[in-house]
């Protein structure tokens, strides 16, 4: 009679997914936030919350990532320069304190402001790091021809119903 002791591996449960590490490469990010009439107060508040959660994953506190923000409707509303907030908490506070206004969707005015004012050294833009512009809107600009910009790749993030 022969006896064998064979170890059969017990399947282990799949570990839960780990959160992604914060973005570590240097980057200057400008968020362009639509506050036009079609957004509505509720969606504007949801967008602020989303943006606050998003920036918590960025490496702002080390200075690796700089963030700015522009709101728009009939024109440019709030403008927060890239060198205005050196911590996640400070930028989140600025986001959550934004007040909703109404108006048309003049995306072209906001993008022109980003190009001429935000992406300058005076506003904290660094010439040696990539720039990223994230537009959060619920629809098309009231002036689509003026909104078209050369050499910019758009990745729309839909906000709305």
Map each language-model feature to its residues.
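Extracellular/periplasmic catalytic domains that process cell-envelope and extracellular macromolecules
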Residues: 22-25, 61-63, 89, 125-129, ...
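Eukaryotic intrinsically disordered and solvent-exposed regulatory patches
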Residues: 16-19, 39-41, 53-57, 115-122, ...
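VWA/integrin I-like adhesion module and closely mimicked acidic/polar interface patches used
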Residues: 139-161
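Extracellular/luminal ectodomains of metazoan preproproteins built from arrays
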Residues: 1-29, 56
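Von Willebrand factor
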Residues: 23-136, 141-147
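Extracellular/luminal ectodomains of secreted and membrane glycoproteins with large N-terminal domains
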Residues: 1-4, 32, 54, 156-161
């Amino acid at each position: 009679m022969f006896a064998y002791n064979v170890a059969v591996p017990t399947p282990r449960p799949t570990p839960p997914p780990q959160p992604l590490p914060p973005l570590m490469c240097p980057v200057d990010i400008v968020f362009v936030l639509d506050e036009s009439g079609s957004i509505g107060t509720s969606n504007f508040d949801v967008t602020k919350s989303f943006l606050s959660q998003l920036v918590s994953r960025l490496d702002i506190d080390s200075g690796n990532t700089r963030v700015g923000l522009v709101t728009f409707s009939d024109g440019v509303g709030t403008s927060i320069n890239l060198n205005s907030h050196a911590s996640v908490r400070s930028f989140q506070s600025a986001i959550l304190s934004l007040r909703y206004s109404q108006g048309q969707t003049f995306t072209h005015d906001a993008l022109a402001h980003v190009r001429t004012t935000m992406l300058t050294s005076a506003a904290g833009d660094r010439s040696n790091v990539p720039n990223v512009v994230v537009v959060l809107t619920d629809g098309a600009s009231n002036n689509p021809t003026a909104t078209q910009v050369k050499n910019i790749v758009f990745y729309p993030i839909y906000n709305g119903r």
